[in-house]
């Protein structure tokens, strides 16, 4: 295992920023460290880098304890949100900086810099200064500079936050391809779940200093381990009494029981669109949101307001329209456990929506 973290804790005064966090990361994996602001993500990243010291706990790289090592002794590349490029240096000199500090021979230095210039798509920009580059180009320089000394671990603190949406989308795909080509273990902090889901091999979700769950994007979305993860990842509706919905009468209720229902677990439409009309219940369209490739439909069922998707290929619905609603499944949880509950009136499997 490349990285092993056990029982990591960090306080800032009375604030418990990181609370008993443990995890392993395999070599070459790209990890998305995801969570709301103040959840402890950046604190974990800075402790891995040696920029902060943990109050207690162990950090090991390839089995070696590194708690006592200085940042420059850990073999880490760090990419900051604001690029942190040297304004008075050209692209070439920015990338070469770490190699010069390590006193790499000139011929080897030039070869490595030009290799990274080519790898990051910066050919022809070697003599330009940071102010002559776009935001996306500056971030590529920052990546190249971090990779130049051939670190064993690459850490990225919200690397796309300062870049506009279109370029950010392009850089996501580019980063994924770059990491795969270089084969370096990488961890990036983000509060953007779409970014984490699209780019990462695995996601670690943090909240209030605790690691809530670690797993592949698919596993975390389909099998959330805690109510926080279930509500944080993806779009969903939270319901206090799921037993009021048709097919879930025996699911239980009470102050401790709650249900989370994702949009894809719900079908909405006119009566003739359902093969099993007896399983559906009446709803009223509250609001429609056009999302480019589909409609997001808010529908009222009794006292509950649910959200679901509707294909553009189906007849358009209108606010106030009476429709039929089928809830296929719900994610239920209480103080002791969580589980997926299927609609007990259903016979045929839930259709796959592509």
Language-model segments: residues:
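ABC ATPase nucleotide-binding domain helices that frame the ATP-binding cleft
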Residues: 42-45, 141
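ABC ATPase nucleotide-binding domains
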Residues: 30, 69-225
């Amino acid at each position: 295992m490349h990285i092993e973290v056990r029982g990591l804790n960090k306080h800032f005064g009375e604030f418990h920023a990181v609370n008993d966090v443990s995890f392993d990361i395999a070599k070459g994996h790209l990890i998305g460290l995801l969570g709301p602001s103040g959840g402890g993500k950046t604190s974990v990243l800075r402790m891995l880098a040696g920029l902060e010291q943990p109050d207690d706990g162990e950090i090991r790289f390839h089995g070696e304890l590194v708690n006592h090592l200085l940042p420059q002794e850990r073999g880490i590349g760090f990419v900051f949100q604001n690029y942190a490029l040297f304004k008075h240096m050209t692209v070439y000199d920015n990338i070469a900086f770490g190699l010069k500090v390590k006193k790499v021979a000139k011929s080897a230095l030039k070869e490595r810099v030009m290799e990274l210039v080519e790898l990051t798509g910066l050919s022809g920009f070697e003599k330009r200064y940071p102010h002559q580059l776009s935001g996306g180009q500056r971030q590529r320089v920052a990546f190249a500079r971090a990779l130049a000394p051939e670190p064993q671990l690459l850490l990225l603190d919200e690397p796309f936050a300062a870049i506009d949406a279109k370029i950010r989308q392009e850089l996501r795909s580019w980063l994924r391809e770059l990491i795969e080509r270089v084969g370096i273990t990488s961890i990036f902090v983000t509060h953007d779940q779409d970014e984490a889901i699209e780019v990462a091999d695995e996601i670690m979700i943090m909240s209030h200093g605790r690691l809530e769950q670690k797993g592949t994007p698919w596993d975390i979305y389909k099998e959330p381990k805690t109510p926080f993860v279930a509500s944080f990842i993806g779009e969903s509706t939270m319901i206090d009494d799921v037993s009021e919905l048709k097919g879930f009468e025996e699911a239980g209720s009470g102050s401790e029981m709650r249900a989370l229902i994702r949009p894809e677990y719900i079908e909405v439409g006119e009566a003739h669109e359902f093969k099993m009309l007896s399983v559906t219940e009446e709803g009223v369209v509250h609001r429609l949101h056009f999302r480019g490739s589909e409609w997001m439909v808010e529908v009222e069922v009794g006292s509950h307001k649910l959200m679901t998707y509707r294909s553009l290929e189906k007849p358009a619905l209108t606010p106030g329209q009476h429709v039929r609603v089928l809830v296929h499944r719900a994610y239920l949880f209480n103080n002791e456990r969580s589980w997926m509950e299927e609609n007990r009136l259903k016979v045929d499997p839930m259709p796959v929506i592509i």
